[in-house]
UniProtKB/Swiss-Prot annotation:
Post-translational modification: The N-terminus is blocked.
Name this protein carries in UniProt: Glucoamylase 1
Swiss-Prot/TrEMBL keywords: Carbohydrate metabolism, Cell wall, Cell wall biogenesis/degradation, Glycoprotein, Glycosidase, Hydrolase, Membrane, Polysaccharide degradation, Secreted, Signal
Pfam families (alphabetical): Glyco_hydro_31_2nd, Glyco_hydro_31_3rd
Region (Disordered) residue spans: 517-541
Gene Ontology biological process: cell wall organization; polysaccharide catabolic process; single-species biofilm formation on inanimate substrate
CDD domains in UniProt: GH31_MGAM_SI_GAA, GH31_N
Glycosylation sites: 51, 68, 97, 187, 244, 373, 393, 406, 437, 505, 570, 704, 772, 801, 895, 912
Membrane topology, as annotated: Peripheral membrane protein
Amino acid sequence: MKLLSKVFVTALGLTSIVNAAPTSSSSAEEAQKTVPVELSIGVKQLPNIHNDSAVDANAVAKGYSLVNVSLTARGLTGILKLKEATNIYGYDFEYLNLSVEYQSDTRLNVHIEPTDLTDVFVLPEELVVKPKLEGDAKTFNFENSDLVFEYDEEDFGFEVLRSSTREVLFSTKGNPLVFSNQFIQFNTTLPKGHSITGLGESIHGSLNEPGVVKTLYANDIADPIDGNIYGVHPVYYDQRYNTNTTHAVYWRTSAIQEVVVGETSLTWRALSGVIDLYFFSGPDPKDVIQQYVSEIGLPAMQPYWALGYHQCRWGYDTVESLETVVENFKKFDIPLETIWSDIDYMDGYKDFTNDPYRFPTDKFRKFLDDLHNNSQHYVPIFDAAIYVPNPNNATDNDYEPFHLGNESDVFLKNPDGSLYIGAVWPGYTVFPDFLANNTQEYWNKMFKDWYERIPFDGIWTDMNEVSSFCVGSCGTGRYFDNPVHPPFEVGYSGSDYPLGFDKSNASEWKSISEAAAATKTTTTTSSSTSTSIDGKNTLAPGKGNINYPPYAINNNQGDHDLATHAISPNATHADGTVEYDIHNIYGLIQERAIYEALLEIHPNKRPFIIGRSSFAGSGKYMGHWGGDNYADYYMMYFSIPQALSMGLSGIPFFGVDACGFNGNTDMELCSRWMQLASFFPFYRNHNVLGAIPQEPYVWEGVMNATKTSINVRYSLLPYYYTLLHESHVTGIPIMRAFNWQFPYSKELAGVDTQFFVGDALLVTPVLEPGVNHTKGVFPGENAVYYDFYTHKKQKFTAGKNETLAAPLGHIPLHIKGGNIIPTQEPGYTTTESRKNPFGLLVALDAEGTASGKLYLDDGESVDVEEALYVDFVASKNKLVASVFGEYEVRQPLANVTILGVDSEPKKVLFNNETVSHNYENGAVYLTDLEKFTKEGAFAEEFSIQW
């Protein structure tokens, strides 16, 4: 294999060296074989949405009629009888069972499944939680429901209406239901000019405008615009400004899906399973988010340290390189909470290992001990596949994770019962089967043994869509070649830079361009147009052709094959379930297993997991990062709607690779991005092997911008932690879209270049190169906004697009009046910060009122025994802090700043004692309050009058 060249970058007197890490230090790389490229090429598919000759199911299907309707205590049941079989994409089911259930005043379930469930996959509750009935069946009265179910019998169709207004929220009437073994389709009407959000995960703006086609199939691919990527969230939110209401529709299915958003309709398709629809009535956006997320699983409460700054890259290939990065952060006084490793630390890229030469255990542990002694943390990457050792190589064959797993029968199989062997980073690999009886026990042991050698603080799960670099069980009969190299060049060797680089770095750009031209060759890579044949491409009994189903979705891989960069749909689990039916939840069930394994290591310590693939309910176990983005401005912009979409999906702890993962960044982009990313819940810088270094100390400008933003972030840690807790108990996201905050203003529906953090902070980033200003809207009639840095009240017109000064190194940040923000003096780590004095930032609204909350606990316990809750209320020139809970905070209150005070007060009282104050530009500053709060800032209730 050709090694990538070294990249030398001089940064502030330092020389950083980034190497392409060898696959293993213990084997000669030149002797290593490669997975044959032809094994990575799938059978070319033509997606139906691009096939002009494809049959339109709506035009052909005859639908069903409804018979034998019976009322129940909670709704009704009935039988759907097929009017005429058309067998468009599979065979039609003749009889279906219909069940309608009013589950609560705000939730309705419509469930349709074949009467004969032979060979039909019904998603078990053990894999994906089912919303529960609320109330006593004997006393429940569905006439009190916010929702009403109505139906037509002869040509079956149904409507869900809002009971208070009779507004139709969902209607299939006039469109035939299609329900076959490999194709389910229904259509609903939408109002013209609709505002549809959700249906993640994809790189797209916040709104799903007419013409959007969402492919819901978990996919290992580097963040394409509009294509299917890592996660699947089958829920949409319909915000209607004519009635000022919002509702949500959730299809509880793990099937392969496709959603087509039209001008006045939405078509939803699935390639297996049953219809299990849940309607949430809202009526406000936050209401409906809370209703949905509460049912799929409230988000995990993250440890306090998770809110610190995280640094990573693919290319930290020795213990010494990690040590150097940590030392450089300290040298330049840039706060660093957590250092991460990509696959470099592994021995031959194998899970549960560390390279004996580059990451020897004794040296590695010494580094981690030093890190922990400084209250810092370490998180390694962990891939989904387990290496199959070469039985002809005694050294290679000594790999317990495979042998124990194989003996315990915990790996996925081919339909014939043999091991399904794909290919990932270490070579030919097998894949844990989380439906097998012994997998959790095996998983617990592997993680515990690994932790005893390498005491990590969290886990970063990757490649868990689940991904494979070849099509089908390509390692069957080939694992004797292990270790083998992936069928592509590893890392990045290009010379592309972000938009605007040629102008802002003209001399450097000239030399790069000349060097690229000098080394450019006319060599081209041939590409095969032939299709490969999957030897296991057989018809699954009773299910049809599941590797190549009759309806082809637009899977965003070059050949659209479902098995490209994935394991084949016919890979089989211990209970007979095939991947075709549950591919989309592999990440969810793997991350849940890791969560349980980490609890085995530390029974009452919050597991910290950042995962790539996700599904409805994943937020209960993990946070999420946005995957392999690109170092360019358009990707920086898309990080905002991606974050907002994840919030809607119940995963509020989200961030992206700041400065970009793929390609080379530059000083300007990295400065802007490091400041924007500092307001995301998860804050990490990460990039690809072979690209230039992009740690914030590489450029002085980036370093200064980063220090400024980390200082702001760390001062706001109590506020962020309070928002984490709010999200944990209610499901309300931390980052908030304009249309959630101001649901009655349709002109704000598509705003996703700005966002709120909680209710209090408005972030307006610069998202383009070469400018020293940005534009932003400040919504809300009579709303008051203050500049976060100067504390000055701003003179903005509600809804107007304002121009804001934003020189490089500055990101506009405003406080919305009516909020009280708890703060704390920032330290180098979150642990240091927690030892420092508190402050309060009070931003009065136009009526002179404000409110806020503070939540604190020990920052790590799963079962919190002692917590502190503080409610802040300001009104009529008086602030009152009401304290609840037993958690003891010894740090004093040092300062309080009150914004929006029209005239200087004659005196200020703290618990009726006069305190000194300063007054400037409408702000009252109180300092030296420690003497009043020696027992702790929130040891008791206090008041401030002015």
